[in-house]
Swiss-Prot record:
This is Nitrate/nitrite transporter NrtP. GO terms for cellular component: plasma membrane. It comes from Picosynechococcus sp. (strain ATCC 27264 / PCC 7002 / PR-6) (Agmenellum quadruplicatum). One of its GO terms (molecular function) is nitrite transmembrane transporter activity. It is found in: Cell inner membrane. GO terms for biological process: nitrate assimilation; nitrate import; nitrite transport. Its main location: membrane. Induction: Transcribed in nitrate-grown cells, but not in cells grown on urea or ammonia. Transcription is probably controlled by the global nitrogen regulator NtcA. The gene is nrtP.
Amino acid sequence: MLGEMWSFNGRYKILHMTWFAFFLSFVVWFNFPPFATTIAQDFGLDKAQLGTIGLCNVALTVPARIIIGMLLDKYGPRLTYSLLLIYAAVPCLIFATAQSFNQLVLGRLLMGIVGAGFVIGIRMVAEWFPPKDVGTAEGIYGGWGNFGSAFSAFTMVIFGIILAFLPGAFNFGQPESFKILFFPEFNTAILNWRAAIAGTGIIAALYGMLYYFSVSDTPPGKTYHRPKSARGMEVTTKKDFWFLLAMNLPLTLILMVLAWRLQKVNFLNGTGFAIAILALVGLYLFQTYNCWTVNKDLMTGKKRYAPEDRYEFSQVAILELTYIVNFGSELAVVTMLPAFFEGTFSLDKATAGIIASSYAFMNLMSRPGGGLISDKMGSRKWTMVVLTVGMGVGYLLMSSVAGTWPLAIAVLLTMACSFFVQAAEGSTFAIVPLVKRRITGQIAGNVGAYGNVGAVAYLTVLLLLTEASAGANGGEPVMATVNAGFFQVLGITGLIVAFLCAFFLKEPKGSFAEFHEGETEMTATPPIEEEATY
């Protein structure tokens, strides 16, 4: 596969167009952080309000990934991805034209739906690549697409300067200093963050239209397998139904945590908070009803699945936990890493940002590397275990980083830790498409949603540690203690999940097969020469 990867024909065309769709969705999703301080000046926001906007950016991604997974299984990735990219222009324009804090929050809440785009490509890539190559293909899709967040961080300010001549530019009053990567520092007094954010949404919408007319859901002659109903996840045993309901509960609880944070910054009053909690309880009950509707015949004894048609929901649950500790921790660490290096080593903001960017840069190699290792090592289970152990140990080592350490050693440790984190993400989604093919979208949606559960949970832990430290030290938190505790939480939870994987994760059936289950050579993806016209 690696030898043909740079081709733009057949399955490789689909792979490249799909990872770029994911890349654009992440550029749009993360177009706020580069302008955070500028927007704070423009609107007079405090740190709590900025933090709330950041949390809102990931909040609706949790239910969105579930819903997108259902729509994906029913309507196919081509239509679903195209419409999501076109939709991305809406929250971008709302945010870019905002005149109040509440409008900013609304824009970022709606933007969280765009973050669900990752799920769509998982199924698209799985349809075009056989099981033996799916880890590498999904790793390339995830790793290269994920780089959109780093690209946004490096380029949005440049776009804001280039577009300064357009209406809506913010004038600092005096030149502000900016530094991007290793380029020389530059000064500007005018930055058009509104035009830059609106522009990314428009670009995403245009690519959404191009994507629709350039790809297909499956290779020629291959059937797109759909579930009987997309209202809820199908399970194949009665005990798995109750397990499914239990694993759906944290998805609702984490949204309650967000509602609590919104109340703390006065976005919601007491009545609004109570209404939000009741609405979330209603959402969980509605989701439960839909799951019952889909699985009613099974639960009432009218239907039994043949052994070869069953899957174990416990395998989905384990993968959800792995994505909490790998992708969830990545999102949380990316948020705090610049401040960590700045405070620990007394660096300026620009230098700390450059060093912290090494964590995101690793995505280009690490996530595909995790998928490749999973494809080549002969056991997807033990690949997952080893990478998750490495991640846990890496975080525990990072908890001991202090200002007395050589900076180069700290940077190397950060990069090594990020390799295990992102390779574990690649390993997770090397398994996801192999659990139950016809509901791959819903499985990917649930697993992906748990990544956001992890991000919100870990960021909340960091916030609580900071507040506790501030309370114990007369109002000023001791960030060295806070950061050490935070990395210890990441490391310990990672090792716990690695232990669970070692005992409960099973090797997927047909992990390294030439064809998907139920396919033959005639219905599988044809050779690249035959696909060249597609």
